[in-house]
Amino acid sequence: MTVNEINNINLEELISMGSFACECGKVHSPGVSKVIVEKGAVNSLPALLEEIGAKKPFLLSGHDTFEAAGASVTAVLENNGIDYAKYVFPVSPVRPTEYTVGSAFMHFDYSCDAIIGIGSGVINDTGKMLARATGLKYIIVATAPSMDGFVSGTSSMDRDGLKVSLYSTAAWAVVGDLDILCQAPMHMLVSGVGDMLAKITSLREWKLAEIIVGEDYCPVTAALVQKALDKVMSSTEGLLKREPEAVSSVMEGLVIAGIAMNYAGVSRPASGMEHYFSHIWDMRSLAFEDAQFEQHGIQAGLGTLYTLMAYEELINKGYKPDREKALNFVKNFSLDDWNGQLRSFVGPGAEAMIEGENREHKYDAAKHAKRLEIIIDRWDEITEVIKTLPPSAEIRKLMESIDFPTSAACIGYDKDGVKTTFTMTKDIRDKYVGTRLYWDLGILEEIAEVFD
């Protein structure tokens, strides 16, 4: 499979061809078997259950999502004589915590032979966890095109206060009923746009990681995501009118992003530094009563805007690697002081971040010096990748056109809060992202001034 070939394949063809040998040297598999995005899609449930030999599905839902689609799902099952059991979380919102996963397990009916999630983000992630543990096929009935995790093989959860991606299982089938999706709250619809905008920066950071630390990169997978992103960005006007074609474009784009993660075997094609803004805000909302949070896609969209602003600062100010400056910066860096800042801002989740550094040693002076030489040698390549990013003003304008927040003030963060969040995004995962590049160059705090 080549870039040109992938650009001429639609979602249905992508799924039907299954696994394929790619020009990157790997064999890619989509993970998902069925994706139905159309009006009346819930009516496909009996046939889907029959295809996997399931007689009694277990329905997992939140209170709000059951109100949105529960009646439609249960009516289809009952009209076709299909028995089912269900658990509807009594709290709203449902948070992606150990309690939520444990509650799902404790209410699971072991006479069931399939799992149907009714919802979006947290419900879907929890349903995938339940499916992996039970070994059952999982179907998600989406209630909003709000995030890209429908078919990915991981679940984004809060464990011990740290946002982590846990291996779960990809949905066997995605049911996107446009009669339901088009009626989702507008807030949820634009959230899906935000999660797609995140691909603007995640794709470039994936390429930067290949250049600097030798991470595997697949141009075919990247092209697939870029094509879906372009389609979503051209559909925003129709989305505001709840036009089925526009809503379908967003839903399919989010599914394609999940397939891309399955192709890559990691979240790189869909998630980078911009997502770590969101993760930190989620972690703080669990740790501190007065810390606010938003829909994942809203936070990821904000993170995208801030990430673009930071890369622009790097280019516009004409920064170039300064070996002496970078080495002195690292020499004077105090890991103990930094860990104290993490604990103060993030709360208990900081312990897992600190433990991650104990395993990775990204702040080790010798490792830094090695990366720095690569950065110096390949600076022109690095900046060429960064220069392919669209202007932040262009993305801000698009966001404003759909009433998308453009400042983290919407969740209570002032400029200092954004700057602190920014500096800590390098500590969430073991990925090489923009803030690691700025740290390696010894200019992290200087770049952060762009948020003043």
Regions found by a protein language model. Give the residues of each.
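ATP/NTP phosphate-donor binding region
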Residues: 2-114
